[in-house]
Amino acid sequence: MHLRPSPQSPQSACCNPELPATEPPTPAEHPTAFRRSQAPSRTPRTFSRETLHILRENRCLAVSKVVHTPDIPPKTPASQAASNRAHRTAKHPARRQSCKLKAPNPCVGHPLRIPSPKHSPRHCTLHDIRHRKKLHPLNNPKGANKRKTPPLIQPTVLEPLPHPVLSPHNISSSTDHPDPSPAIKPSPPNNTRHILLTTKSLLLILTHPIISAYPFHPYFSFTPHEHHIRSRDTQN
């Protein structure tokens, strides 16, 4: 919806024919100015010099491309039928070709589409099978998408150590030929360290403040006999 400027505004000189002003430009003369005169008033834009140059060139091209097309006569039923026949014969070979490319089996779909793995190969067309094999990385002849299998890493098996075979030559006295691999004997227990630890733990227990004050407690500082005497004196 276009808004017309008021007669008092300076822009109304080109839009109001009653005022003594120049006539508005026609589309053939200047389409850009015509559209600008019919458009509502907007705030002016600021363009750079390069942008103004491009706009000026586009405006000249738009003026030069104005072509007056003759009026097209209305179509009659006969002309409509003739145009339909021409349209079918001239414009539809590509569409007919695309219809021929459709696969006969509806479960396969378009031949350019790769079928899903659930369909067996006998349900797919020849193009589908070739296309699927071409896209498969292992069947690619160029080897661009070929997967390189990593070398197989053999598991390391620890071989058992060879046991010494007893033979008449190996059997001899231990003094002449000592055993090359004697069995590892457990070391004897360190009795000195055990005694030191026991002594240290006893000293810690005896020097504890509660335990060390136990013999000097007032309740335990007398014998039962003295306690009996004291209790008898208090009763008297």
Curated annotation (Swiss-Prot):
The organism's place on the tree of life at top rank: Eukaryota
Protein name: Uncharacterized protein ECU07_0030/ECU09_2040
Compositional bias (Basic residues): 85-99
Region (Disordered): 1-48, 67-122, 134-192
Source organism of the structure: Encephalitozoon cuniculi (strain GB-M1)
Amino acid composition bias (Pro residues), ranges on this chain: 180-189
